[in-house]
Amino acid sequence: MYENTPVERVRENVLFTPEGRVKAEKIVFACHFPFVNFPGLYFAKMHQERSYVVALENAMEVNGMYIGAEKRDFSFRSYGPYLLLGGEGHRCGDKTGQAARYEKLREKAARWFPESREACCWSAQDCVTADSVPFIGRFSGSRQNWYVATGFQKWGMTTAMTAAMLIRDDICGFTNPNREVFRPGRLPVKDLDFFLSDGVRSVKELAKPFFYDPQKTARDILPGHGGIVTYKGRKIGIYKDEQQNIHGVEIRCPHLGCQLSWNPDEKSWDCPCHGSRFDYEGKLLNGPAQSGL
């Protein structure tokens, strides 16, 4: 086990890291979103969705975990002395209905648990496939010694166990009856519209840096807010902190070049194409990008 050693690229059975090379007969990509674009094309077969959680003290204790059946519903679970209230999910980088997502959760908490107090809050994201079934198995037809586990759609605790058994069985030569269900190379015909809509979205976002001309300047950005502005004839993303210091970044994602959008709830720059995220100073927060801005 090589800890604190990020893999930068992979070629056949060799992993390249900043400190050297590692050879392996079998390689498992269990890294949330596969950072190798070709082969596999996972960036074209998934997107990432982000959701938000507030931890409440002095709220009711619930046994088990609960989630609403509707797309915009909420989830509940107890953890020690806290009740975790989750919801307000959205596609990463989607500006529709953005901002005040934590506030909306706090409003629900005040309505449902008026005696509760907020202890902390956070957000996270996960990969979503076209048919909502994870990709678990061999990475691609041309890389039979590579394996992948991704697209858990926020069901990581159960799906991780499934992935462990499926990949173990394949590596050890055992037959698993569920192998075809999770096969990464599948392409459900009924979900072709998902691929088409995702493809159109990516093309649109890739074209934005060339055709979208922001009308704002740094003076138009209020303290505590961020946005895309024109500076010396080029587009940049800026965040103006409460002391009115300006933090500027390159606005194109280093993964495949999509234009980033500002997430006011997390004060981050998010990629609407494949879900990479960066803090307001450009530091990488989430992949598949492998470097900061």
What residue spans do the PLM features occupy?
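A glycine-rich dinucleotide-binding beta-alpha-beta segment and adjacent secondary-structure elements
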Residues: 119-127, 145-148, 205-252
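Rieske [2Fe-2S] iron-sulfur-binding domain
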Residues: 54, 227-293
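Short, hydrophobic/aromatic-rich segments at coil-to-beta transitions
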Residues: 12-14, 61-64, 222-227, 246, ...
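Short loop/edge segments at beta-strand edges and connector loops
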Residues: 3-5, 11, 120-122
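C-terminal catalytic lobe of FAD-dependent flavoproteins
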Residues: 70-71, 80, 93-107, 111-199, ...
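Flavin-dependent oxidoreductases
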Residues: 6-77, 205, 213-219
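Short glycine-rich, flexible loops that bind phosphorylated cofactors or substrates
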Residues: 36-37, 92, 261
